[in-house]
Amino acid sequence: CKDCYKCVRECPVKAIEVKDHQARIIESRCILCGHCTLICPQNAKIVHSSLEDIKQILNSGAKVIASVAPSFISSFGLSDFNVFKIALAKLGFFDAEETAYGAELVTQQYKTLLESKQFKNFITSACPAVCRLIQAYYPKALQYLAPVDSPMIAHAKMLRKQHPDAKIVFIGPCIAKKREAMESGIIDGVLTFDDMQELFHERNIVLDEIINISLENKRTTACLSKAYPISHGILKSFPELPKGYDYMAVDGPDRCVDALQNIDNLENVFLEMNICKDGCVNGPCSLSVNIKGGSIKATSEVLKYYKNDIRTLAPHQYEEYGIDLNKLYPRIRNNSMPPPEREIKSILAKIGKHSEADELNCGACGYATCRDKAWAVYNGYTDAEICLPYMRERAESLSYEIIQHSPNGIILLDSDFYIQDINNKG
């Protein structure tokens, strides 16, 4: 960490504190969007890996089943899930399925809720970072959040119903899934695509060498929800959109925050909301940044897979699982306090801001406005002195005092040898 404050500036909920010149994540405020791990110039923030724990599970002889996020297609440059499934079998997994089958049940639940007309507005609950954002920072919008499990949890419940004794591991590009899995109690671990790449390399598994191998009688079935990881993907999972709502996709932290701030002014709007710009294909642990074309190419690959899938494969037949997908999303207190006006003025005065004209709102400290900075100081998230104009003014003032009180004659010249300053001794 080199005092650049880029992570503070970029964090949508200001869940980062700066103490002793080090930026640290405030766990209770973090929504686990993972954005700070991507934009840190020094790579000072890393994602905790569960790889060693999963290795122990795989080596224990337990029946381990993987639930694989459909964005694997773009991250690993594949066009067939069977290739990934074979690779997982080589690692010791008993079986693997696409999380999209759980997403299909989620879409069905959304359809039922939309047709009931009980929601003024409707926000999808597939993204755990969005759910956390609403729970902790926009609790008034909880009335619009779909009371439905995420696709990962829905699929885990399906697998648990079929294999009660199995260990279930989710594989995907999302950091927020780690907390969601831990809180659910039905998922035994989460591996990111970064973890999988490391594991494949460690075991000398080359996906390109598996491409031409097929699993006899093991072809996957078509599923509209395989488009979930891209922007507008949830909308594509509906065979027909229920009438009565305007449907739109909102992705990226800034657009999500903007939508939530204004949602009370909307009516009959369905919001497919993802914290990651362009959807899960651009998740913090996706590998799309390593491919030419980035998230746009990744979106194209998933779309191609989705279209080919529904065109060539038999529709997936869902048996009656008897699974309850209802989910309550309670409000979460984030423990920050709004400072009284007198405290704001007192904090600003300490750094030479005595009037509104002194509040430059330059954003160098990581906060959009000087008053936002005062809020952070009041809550103990940063130091008041971390203010570029204040530090510059103080440094210039100190330099002036040193020059004027030096026992030596001092003359300051610019690069063209014009005199800029001279003390009394000079």
PLM regions and their residue ranges:
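Iron-sulfur-associated redox domains of electron-transfer enzymes in respiratory
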Residues: H48-A349, S355, A368-N379
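Short, flexible, mixed-charge glycine/proline-rich loop motifs
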Residues: C1-D3, R29-C30, E267, K350-E356
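Sensory modules in modular signal-transduction proteins
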Residues: A395-G426
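Conserved phosphate/pyrophosphate-binding and hydrolysis machinery centered on Walker-type P-loop NTPases
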Residues: L78, G363-Y367, L413
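Iron-sulfur cluster-binding cysteine motifs and their immediate structural context
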Residues: K2-I26, I31, H35-L51, P284-V289, ...
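Sterile Alpha Motif
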Residues: Y378, L388-E393, S397
